[in-house]
């Protein structure tokens, strides 16, 4: 009896050979071609029938898979039928790709049944023919799967997991005691990698659930790219080939094309008798597939890939990697830093240009999150991987250098606070230095210097301020799913900071200084060319150009790789480090200054530039740089003359905005000879006590730094340092001179000679720079009488972060100890008036600064002390008119930089000579009220170039005994405001000041009605009646 069949069943059955001929269909196992064509045509014209066709094929595959697991002729027959079913499935997936939704479920079940039938058993190894045919069908399924219209469900993930496990399988040989069968392993893994290549080339892998899929794909690919079977040089060569799209094994080369024109690949098993694939073929296939995966990934997918690589390195990947079966122990992949660096660089090079920075960001974020605890090989490898990317030849467009620097610097500080000799600190410094290798925007290096300077300044501030700033910086991790880790890191960091002492703080500062030096060194070793920023104004013919082009011209981006030089003001908060109580910090900062002055800061030209190529006017250049020179000069003065650089805790607690506020207070404390705990003036001192003050190497280092400052910024140095040097020579004789029997070996004598050596060396450099022979001869005469200290620290260490140098006290410098104190030790060794007159008369200085001799002399002979210098540093004071009239944003920084303890103006010498008791008598609230910045009518009068009698009294201030300051001091403070352009103020009683006087603006009327204050009547007001003559402006036409 003939039982009729449905049309789809008849078409499917006709595709198979007769039952007796199934076994003879080996080894091709092909379906009947004509009948397969009819089935395909039927499915294309009736897409809904694909469901029935698929269900029928699925039932056949399940039955044939069960038969194939057995043994004997039945197994061979079942295998043949299963192979033909897989071939029919692949053909339908390829030809009916527009109706794939009807066939996805059955096809996944067919492939899964085939993989289950091919599993190895105790009686036989894995069936590679079934595995290869199943991989080909999966390749077709993945290639034509459209996530927009199809659902990538758990069935697809299970298949992907199965092929990923196939790609990392370790099959045993016929004799299990011999371990793995290398040839069988390579064949098996190559089949699995072929299926994974199909998944990488599909759209399914880049769907919304890409994280689950990538967690299976990535470990399988990286596992096959290890260097245990090939050399690292071969891996580098293969990586370069893959980057160019030409790997050695190109069968699975990923070329993602539009869905309509995609083609499937036939993955075949190894043919008996042929030479099996080599380990190089497997590694090349894995590298090519991984490169294709990264090349088509976006930022989120690249981040997920790198996170899965890190999880695989931790042996915590979502894919279970089998352990070696040949007796070898499983070792951590972090123990091979060279291979890890190759992997990081390769991942970065294979990623699209616009997403390469994600690789580095992910590595740095993971390092910052997991940087606690004992130093391990993982920490070291992560640091070296990050450094390899930063210093490589790859461009990282889009990289946030600020976030990267913040994370790495915060980690370095945390490691220092855990252990000041932590083994990760040198590689961390090298990694941070790598940020200077590539320049991605014009002000990148300047921003890096400002970031590091800000961190250093925060570390010098009181704990309540520095802790908050440091924790805030350390929390800038900028990624997702890290909230709990951030809270834990913040808590640990705050707890560590609370338990830390000055040693950890000083070492943190020293490490950051080495980071700064490393960034500058890497910047100058790179090929980037330095260009000054020029504001290019477009003319009328260029108005139609794109807005982006005009924006580039404004920030000075003329060509790729160009950058602006570091602005001197960026290191202003760090100038007080020259007077740090830690000798290693002082030396590191002096070396940093030498590097900046020698290589980085824009040099001031001594010759007048032509109008065509002239940059900013000299007045603007000086105003930009002189604030830093003021601050460095004040710190150098404090360092040279201080008996102890360790401030009391109460003084440190008074700091509120800037570490520079500390300099005047240290100077005042050391100027008081009766201060308890001061160093003995007659004894040689112990090494512990001597280390709290300047050492011989400090004097030499600061002399070198100031000499480089003269070379790089000659005009600013001459205007800012000359009064300091004259004062240093004078104060060395008055404050470091002790008359006693043991004076020949006293610290005071040694420091006095060293301080005068510093002043003489810098003045000799100034004399040489501005061709003033009298200054050079006078300075050389002083130097000829001072023996050499025999110590030359050099600009900076060559090999990055090193241990602090040993303390070499003055007692170890024999030459200077042989010089006793002469009868003229208390007198200045240099004629200050001669120095000032000679420099003011220098035609070269006048030409360079574009100031006349009278203006220069007035400026150079102004009052100088540390307090004044710090105020001038904040205000950027210079003898140019515009420098005394700051903008609104600058006014707040011009307030006194330290707390006036006597309730009076802190600009004069009265404050410097104050007592310690007065500091303790002022509470915090009063200090805050005295430091509140304000702008009133008197400030307006001073800005307009004159002052009424009342404002003159307030500007001159009083001494502690209530007497008025002399008219000379008033005139010199007036000169610090710069030359006054009188034409701007009007004349003939119509000036703004005259109008203010006529309206009695700013005059206390109630006080005027009471008459003249009798307490002031007996004091001659010379400073009021004999006012100083106005200074002629330097620019007159």
From Swiss-Prot:
Protein name: Protein EFR3
Location of the region described as Disordered in the Swiss-Prot/TrEMBL record: 881-901, 947-988, 1006-1037
Organism annotation: Mycosarcoma maydis (Corn smut fungus)
Biased composition (Basic and acidic residues): 966-977
Annotated Polar residues bias: 948-965
Domain of life per record: Eukaryota
Similarity comment: Belongs to the EFR3 family.
InterPro entries the UniProt entry points to: EFR3 (IPR039786), EFR3_HEAT-like_rpt (IPR049150)
GO biological process terms, semicolon-separated: protein localization to plasma membrane
């Amino acid at each position: 009896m003939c039982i009729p069949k449905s049309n789809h069943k008849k078409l499917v059955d006709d595709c198979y050979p007769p039952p007796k001929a199934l076994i003879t269909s080996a080894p091709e196992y092909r379906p009947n071609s004509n009948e397969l064509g009819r089935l395909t045509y039927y499915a294309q014209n009736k897409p809904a029938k694909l469901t029935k066709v698929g269900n029928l094929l699925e039932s056949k595959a399940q039955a044939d898979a069960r038969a194939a697991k057995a043994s004997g002729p039945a197994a061979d027959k079942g295998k043949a039928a299963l192979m033909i079913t897989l071939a029919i499935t692949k053909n339908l997936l390829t030809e009916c790709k527009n109706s794939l939704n009807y066939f996805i479920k059955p096809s996944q079940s067919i492939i899964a049944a085939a993989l289950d039938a091919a599993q190895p058993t105790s009686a036989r190894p894995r069936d590679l023919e079934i595995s290869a045919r199943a991989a080909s069908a999966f390749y077709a399924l993945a290639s034509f799967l459209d996530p927009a219209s199809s659902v990538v469900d758990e069935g697809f993930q299970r298949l992907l997991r199965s092929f990923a496990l196939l790609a990392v399988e370790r099959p045993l040989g016929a004799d299990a005691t011999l371990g793995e069968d290398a040839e069988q392993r390579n064949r098996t893994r190559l089949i699995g990698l072929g299926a994974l290549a199909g998944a990488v080339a599909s759209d399914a892998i880049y769907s919304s659930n890409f994280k689950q899929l990538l967690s299976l794909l990535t470990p399988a690919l990286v596992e096959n790219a290890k260097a245990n079977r090939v050399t690292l040089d071969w891996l580098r060569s293969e990586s370069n080939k893959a980057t160019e799209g030409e790997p050695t094994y190109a069968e699975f080369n990923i070329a993602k094309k539009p869905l309509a024109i995609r083609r499937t690949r036939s993955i075949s098993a190894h043919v008996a008798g042929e030479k099996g694939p080599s380990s190089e073929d497997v590694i090349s296939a894995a590298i090519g597939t991984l490169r294709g995966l990264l090349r088509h990934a976006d930022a989120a997918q690249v981040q997920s890939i790198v996170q899965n690589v890190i999880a695989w390195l931790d042996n915590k990947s979502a894919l279970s990697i089998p352990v070696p079966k040949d007796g070898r122990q499983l070792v951590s992949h972090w123990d091979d830093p060279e291979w890890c660096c190759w992997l990081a660089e390769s991942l970065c090079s294979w990623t699209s240009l616009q997403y390469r920075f994600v690789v580095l960001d992910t590595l740095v974020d993971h390092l910052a999150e997991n940087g606690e605890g004992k130093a391990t090989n993982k920490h070291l490898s992560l640091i070296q991987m990050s450094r390899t990317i930063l210093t490589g030849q790859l461009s990282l467009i889009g990289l946030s250098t600020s976030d990267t620097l913040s994370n790495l610097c915060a980690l370095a500080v945390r490691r220092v606070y855990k252990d000041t000799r932590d083994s990760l600190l040198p590689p961390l410094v090298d990694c941070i230095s790598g940020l200077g290798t590539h320049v991605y925007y014009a002000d990148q290096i300047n921003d890096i210097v400002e970031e590091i300077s800000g961190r250093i300044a925060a570390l010098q501030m009181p704990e309540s301020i520095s802790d908050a700033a440091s924790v805030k910086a350390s929390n800038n991790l900028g990624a997702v799913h890290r909230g709990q880790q951030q809270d834990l890191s913040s808590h640990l960091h705050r707890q560590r900071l609370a338990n830390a002492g000055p040693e950890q703080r000083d070492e943190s500062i020293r490490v950051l200084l080495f980071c700064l030096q490393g960034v500058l060194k890497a910047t100058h070793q790179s090929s980037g060319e330095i260009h000054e920023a020029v504001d290019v104004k477009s003319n009328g013919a260029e108005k139609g150009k794109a807005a982006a082009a005009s924006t580039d011209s404004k920030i000075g981006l003329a060509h790729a790789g160009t950058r602006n030089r570091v602005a001197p003001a960026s290191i202003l908060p760090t100038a007080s480090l020259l007077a740090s109580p830690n000798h290693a910090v002082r030396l590191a900062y002096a070396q940093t200054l030498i590097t900046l002055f020698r290589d980085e800061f824009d040099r001031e030209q001594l010759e007048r530039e032509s109008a065509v190529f002239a940059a900013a006017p000299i007045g603007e250049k000086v105003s930009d740089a002189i604030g830093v020179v003021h601050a460095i000069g004040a710190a150098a003065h404090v360092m040279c003359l201080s008996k102890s650089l360790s401030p009391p805790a109460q003084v440190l607690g008074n700091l509120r905005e800037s570490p520079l506020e500390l300099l005047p207070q240290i100077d005042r404390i050391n100027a008081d000879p009766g201060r308890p705990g001061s160093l003995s003036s007659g004894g040689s001192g112990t090494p512990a006590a001597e280390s709290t003050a300047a050492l011989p190497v400090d004097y030499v280092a600061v002399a070198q730094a100031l000499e480089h400052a003269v070379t790089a910024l000659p005009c600013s140095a001459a205007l800012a340092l000359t009064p300091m040097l004259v004062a240093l020579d004078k104060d060395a004789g008055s404050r470091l001179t002790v008359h006693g029997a043991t004076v020949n070996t006293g610290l005071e004598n040694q420091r006095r000679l060293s301080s005068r050596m510093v002043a003489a060396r810098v003045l000799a450099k100034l004399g040489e720079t501005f061709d003033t022979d009298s200054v050079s001869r006078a300075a050389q005469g002083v130097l000829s009488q001072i023996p050499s200290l025999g110590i030359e620290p050099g600009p900076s260490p060559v090999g990055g972060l090193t241990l602090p140098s040993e303390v070499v006290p003055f007692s170890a410098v024999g030459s200077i100890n042989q010089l006793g104190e002469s009868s003229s030790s208390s007198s200045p060794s240099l004629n200050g008036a001669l120095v000032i007159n000679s420099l003011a008369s220098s035609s070269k200085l006048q030409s360079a600064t574009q100031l006349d001799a009278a203006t220069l002399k007035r400026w150079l002979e102004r009052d100088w002390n540390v307090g004044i210098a710090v105020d001038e540093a904040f205000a950027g004071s210079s003898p140019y008119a515009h420098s005394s009239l700051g903008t609104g944003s600058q006014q707040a920084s011009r307030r006194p930089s330290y707390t006036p303890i006597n309730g009076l103006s802190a600009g004069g010498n009265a404050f410097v000579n104050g007592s310690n008791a007065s500091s303790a008598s002022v509470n915090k609230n009063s200090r805050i009220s005295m430091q509140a910045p304000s702008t009133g009518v008197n400030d307006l009068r001073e800005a307009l170039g004159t002052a009424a009698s009342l404002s003159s009294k307030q500007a001159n201030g009083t001494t502690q005994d209530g007497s008025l300051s002399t008219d000379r001091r008033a005139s010199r403070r007036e000169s610090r405001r710069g030359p006054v352009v009188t034409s701007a103020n009007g004349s003939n009683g119509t000036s703004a000041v005259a109008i203010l006087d006529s309206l009695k603006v700013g005059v206390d009327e109630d006080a005027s009605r009471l008459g003249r204050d009798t307490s002031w009547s007996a004091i001659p007001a010379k400073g009021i009646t004999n006012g100083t003559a106005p200074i002629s402006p330097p620019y007159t036409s």
